[in-house]
Amino acid sequence: GPTLIVSGDDLRKIFKFNKYTATERKVLGKYYCDYAKFITNQKINLIFAVVAMRDSTRHWNKKNIDNYLEIYIKTNIKTIIKANKKKIYHKKNSGDIVGINIKPELPKKSDITINNNFKKSTDILSKELIRKIRTII
């Protein structure tokens, strides 16, 4: 069926959510859940890339979104800092960063886990992910 690909960063830009505190992230997480349910209720597949969801958010999604599939892209925070693709880890006074001064709630029971050490291309990781998805659905 039709599929929509959304990034949490994209929604932040569209709706001008520019606060990153733990409290604001919790509120935004609930908005993301409601948005995901709205889209999937219309029989649209949704691939939603977000960072650092909470255990309560994941639980809500599993309970309330039909055919919910959680994919965890696992990597070490030191590897992320070294890659620094978004240029957020070297900003002066960069507060409210998950993994730095906000403790992440890492998934405990993801349907799929992909280990990313930044040594494989995104093309290779994508193929690995598709292969794993096909074994589930």
Give the label of every model feature segment.
Residues 3-5, 68-72, 111-113:
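Conserved beta-strand scaffold positions in the cores of enzyme catalytic domains, especially
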Residues 22-33, 55, 74-78, 107, ...:
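Amphipathic alpha-helical transducer elements in NTP-driven molecular machines
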